[in-house]
Amino acid sequence: MKPKVFITRAIPENGIDMLREHFEVEVWPEEREIPREVLLEKVRDVDALVTMLSERIDGEVFDNAPRLRIVANYAVGYDNVDVEEATRRGIYVTNTPDVLTNATADFAWTLLLATARRLIEADSFTRSGEWKRKGIAWHPLMFLGHDVYGKTIGIIGFGRIGQAVARRAKGFGMRILYYSRTRKPEAEEELKAEFKPLEELLKESDFVVLAVPLTKETYHMIGERELKLMKPTAILVNIARGKVVDTEALIKALKEGWIAGAGLDVFEEEPYYNEELFSLKNVILAPHIGSATFGAREGMAELVARNLIAFKNGEVPPTLVNKEVVKVKKPGFR
């Protein structure tokens, strides 16, 4: 009899096809997030669970899932999973790093360039017919933006995605600064990147890109004090987690001109709507789509499947998050 896996949202078929060879597979069929009470019911007879960032996977879920042995999170981050509690119970937790690195770094640059050059404003101006109504074919002062080439970029969080952002910055001839919990000598050499304390990075950067995981230490690490350290011409890009930035402080910074603009792919709560923030012209907004390319999402689905299949075969999953769990229970559904 095959072990059973429940997938909380439809993922690309390549991953599901791989899983069907080894598991009894059930997929939540709706686009909306699975209701909490339904999730708690569905996990009662599953051996494995594929989850999204939007689901809170905690002790309550584990209490309702007596057979659960592994949680495969369809994301590189895993702040939605109580990893410590999972480890205590011998439940393996995996994620999907690497396969979404380039897509997410590309999107950081999409936000950076679009914000710097006021792309959404210009698109709206053109699409609405305002350009035609004004009757001005070209004007020296129309939609002036900020130069990118040769400027200074500060990257907060210098893991895979942060370094991928930096590689792209090299092509723009930029000075690259970074801040991280630990220094990265090899990356510094490869990318000609300079390690800076957070305050110095904020003061010196023309563009600040957030690429840190959400932890107790990074919660609201960018608040009023930090935003006031930035240049009034600087642009903030957040591809990390919404809670890394104090939203109320950011709104104030954008309205009062402490910084020039922001590009946001993540928010403190998701889905999200904030009329005050969303009415501002100097911010570009996206609904958490940093990894939303066909290649990245298919790669994530394949990695989810590889993790679960490895576990089923009694092997340590390739991208195991809680490595200490192997001391609690060996991999496998035995």
UniProtKB/Swiss-Prot annotation:
For this record, an example GO cellular component is: cytosol
Tell me the active site: R241, E270, H288
Q: Where does NADP(+) bind?
A: F158, G159, R160, I161, S180, R181, T182, I239, A240, R241, H288, I289, G290
In terms of superkingdom, the source organism counts as Archaea
SMART domains listed in its UniProt record: AdoHcyase_NAD (SM00997)
What is the protein's major site of localization? Answer: cytoplasm
Q: Which GO terms describe its molecular function?
A: glyoxylate reductase (NADH) activity; glyoxylate reductase (NADPH) activity; hydroxypyruvate reductase [NAD(P)H] activity; NAD binding
Kindly state which reaction or reactions the protein catalyses. Answer: glycolate + NAD(+) = glyoxylate + NADH + H(+)
**Entry keywords, A to Z:** Cytoplasm, NAD, Oxidoreductase
List, alphabetically, the NCBIfam families matched. PRK13243.1
Description of how the protein assembles with itself and partners: Homodimer.
Protein name as catalogued: Glyoxylate reductase
